[in-house]
């Protein structure tokens, strides 16, 4: 079996799937760039071997098992944490690598389900070029623009926002708080340093381990679970330093 993932390039991902099927893969672990397109393409391709799908999807003849985190719930929980801690008078900018990418729209709907009724003004900024996020933040230094809170709706957006803010104390004066979805070692360090105020994380080690386990079972014709849902957790600096989720956040250490 083989794990396939091409970041933000669904065409390349489809080519890889077809290539590996032709080469006789016994199972495929697929982390889709775009869930909707991936499901349609799998139906067209009819891979002939079981697919372990990292994301929520309907189980069919191709998809043996789906492993996912509830993105809507993740967005809703993040929205609750923001509403508990922040002033609704400060606008919220939601930054996204693209709403078409897997899970982003669900997370967006989840966070807005809380922030809108709580009286927050919410603006969506989708990445259109390499400097989309930086330009949006640069605008805050002009008096007529005003301050805002930033939320990275995916790990790519959150990582870039954190790096931009860490590199400029001026920007940090105008972006009142940074929240987001996703965790990397770099992001956890930035959370510890206070660049990121809070983020949603889930057990990536379990996700990877389970996907391989289910692929082996499916290749051998034996598996039971059709859908596995991972539980997201909210992490802030205090929770991080408490060590409660140390095994989840740093599984290899």
Language model: regions and residue ranges:
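Short beta-strand elements in bilobed, periplasmic/extracellular small-molecule ligand-binding domains
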Residues: 1-7, 91-94, 112-134, 147-149
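Structural motif
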Residues: 2-23, 125-144, 157-161
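Periplasmic-binding protein-like
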Residues: 24-32, 50-54, 92-96, 122-123, ...
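Flexible loop/hinge segments that line or gate small-molecule binding clefts
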Residues: 34-73, 184-192
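Venus flytrap/periplasmic-binding-protein-like
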Residues: 51-56, 155-161, 166-198, 235-236
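Hydrophobic alpha-helical segments within soluble ligand-binding/sensing domains
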Residues: 66-92, 106, 133-137, 182-188, ...
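Short, solvent-exposed amphipathic alpha-helices that sit
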Residues: 74-78, 102-121, 136, 160, ...
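Hinge/cleft segment of the Venus flytrap/periplasmic-binding protein
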Residues: 114-118, 203-253
């Amino acid at each position: 079996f083989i794990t396939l993932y091409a970041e933000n390039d669904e065409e390349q991902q489809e080519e890889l799937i077809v290539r590996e099927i032709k080469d006789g893969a016994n199972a495929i672990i697929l982390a889709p760039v775009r869930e909707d397109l991936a499901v349609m393409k799998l139906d067209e391709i009819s891979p002939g071997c079981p697919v372990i799908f990292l994301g929520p999807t309907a189980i069919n003849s191709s998809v043996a098992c789906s492993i996912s985190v509830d993105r809507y719930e993740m967005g809703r929980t993040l929205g609750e944490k923001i509403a508990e801690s922040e002033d609704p008078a400060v606008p919220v900018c939601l930054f996204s690598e693209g709403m078409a990418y897997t899970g982003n729209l669900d997370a967006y709907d989840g966070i807005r389900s809380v922030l809108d009724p709580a009286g927050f003004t919410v603006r969506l900024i989708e990445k259109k070029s390499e400097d989309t996020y930086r330009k949006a933040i640069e605008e805050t230094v002009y008096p007529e623009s005003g301050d805002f809170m930033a939320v990275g709706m995916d790990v790519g957006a959150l990582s870039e926002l954190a790096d931009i803010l860490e590199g400029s104390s001026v920007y940090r004066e105008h972006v009142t708080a940074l929240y987001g979805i996703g965790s990397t070692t770099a992001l956890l360090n930035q959370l510890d340093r206070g660049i990121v105020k809070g983020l949603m994380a889930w057990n990536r080690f379990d996700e990877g381990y389970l996907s391989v386990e289910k692929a082996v079972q499916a290749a051998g014709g034996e598996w039971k679970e059709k859908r596995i849902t991972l539980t997201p957790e909210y992490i802030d600096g205090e929770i991080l330093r408490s060590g409660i989720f140390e095994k989840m956040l740093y599984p290899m250490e």
